[in-house]
């Protein structure tokens, strides 16, 4: 009942003029932070995981946790495959119960990207599974994939329309100047490009690489059509730095129930801020 499709979430966001945050989690504690914070704020959220996370934690384990927490907190949740690239991997996760997928073929030439994505869409839609794909490519590192800045490229607005129509995707991830990881200096986002994409494509648009973006930039992208905001690195950094600080100050600590609390608290602050930036509090 409480594990829902991202398609309905994002369509609601598009109509309501806000964005749904997708938080990348890795284990029980990081999932607890996201779900507890979202439930307290009555905010829709997406629980996202890269291929590495699903391998690390196990698909069935993650699904069981999401289902149990959704029921415990009486809060709708979606679980999402983030930056998955292999058809067999996606199909296996769907058979386990995942109902939202990002197929990332953005590294391929345009025609091959369309072909790969359409294959996944045709399969997923048979099971009422929503599909996100990316046109353009972000720089930085996501999981084990490293894209050099020189190889990154922005989304072409006219191609975006052709891509959306040819593939039948439910949401489109765009490249407008963000990158995976944290920024050494503030990025300059191409808002005019985003506005142009919005004029060509009526699907919910997705922004990857949002860790470290200013509130002003996030809210401007939402005004121009972004309906899903992905955050990963900022969560990991907050969690790990707080944990390091605690263990440095308390070298005698051995109980994870104690030393993980400061890490969870630091991550909770980031989740709360992103929810506020997305304008989705009270929208669940």
UniProtKB/Swiss-Prot annotation:
Any Gene Ontology biological process: galactitol catabolic process
Entry's EC annotation: 4.1.2.40
Function: Catalytic subunit of the tagatose-1,6-bisphosphate aldolase GatYZ, which catalyzes the reversible aldol condensation of dihydroxyacetone phosphate (DHAP or glycerone-phosphate) with glyceraldehyde 3-phosphate (G3P) to produce tagatose 1,6-bisphosphate (TBP). Requires GatZ subunit for full activity and stability. Is involved in the catabolism of galactitol.
Cofactor: Zn(2+)
HAMAP family xref list: TagBP_aldolase_GatY (MF_01294)
One of the record's GO molecular function terms: zinc ion binding
Residue ranges crossing the lipid bilayer per the database entry: none
Active-site residues from the entry: 82 (proton donor)
GO-annotated cellular components: cytosol
Substrates-to-products reaction catalysed: D-tagatofuranose 1,6-bisphosphate = D-glyceraldehyde 3-phosphate + dihydroxyacetone phosphate
Induction comment: Constitutively expressed.
Protein name: D-tagatose-1,6-bisphosphate aldolase subunit GatY
């Amino acid at each position: 009942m409480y594990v829902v499709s991202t398609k309905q979430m994002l369509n609601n966001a598009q109509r309501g003029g806000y964005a749904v945050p997708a938080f990348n989690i890795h284990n029980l504690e990081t999932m607890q932070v996201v779900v507890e914070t979202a439930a307290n704020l009555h905010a829709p959220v997406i629980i996202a995981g890269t291929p590495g996370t699903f391998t690390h934690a196990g698909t069935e384990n993650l699904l069981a946790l999401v289902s149990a927490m959704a029921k415990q907190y009486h809060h709708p949740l979606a679980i999402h495959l983030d930056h998955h690239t292999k058809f067999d991997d996606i199909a296996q996760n769907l058979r386990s119960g995942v109902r939202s997928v990002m197929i990332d073929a953005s590294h391929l030439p345009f025609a091959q990207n369309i072909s790969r994505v359409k294959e996944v869409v045709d399969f997923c839609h048979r099971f009422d599974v929503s599909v996100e794909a990316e046109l353009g490519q972000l720089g930085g590192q996501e999981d084990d994939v490293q894209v050099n800045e020189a190889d990154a490229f922005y989304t072409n607005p006219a191609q975006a329309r052709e891509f959306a129509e040819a593939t039948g995707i439910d949401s489109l991830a765009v490249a407008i100047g963000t990158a995976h990881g944290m920024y050494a200096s503030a990025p300059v986002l191409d808002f005019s490009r985003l506005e142009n994409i919005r004029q060509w494509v009526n699907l919910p648009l997705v922004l990857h690489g949002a860790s470290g973006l200013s509130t002003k930039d996030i809210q401007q992208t939402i005004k121009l059509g972004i309906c899903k905001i992905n955050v990963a690195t900022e969560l990991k950094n907050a969690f790990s730095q707080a944990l390091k600080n605690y263990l440095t100050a308390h070298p005698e600590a051995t109980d994870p129930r104690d030393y993980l609390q400061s890490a969870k608290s630091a991550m909770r602050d980031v989740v709360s801020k992103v929810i506020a930036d997305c304008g989705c509090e009270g929208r669940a």
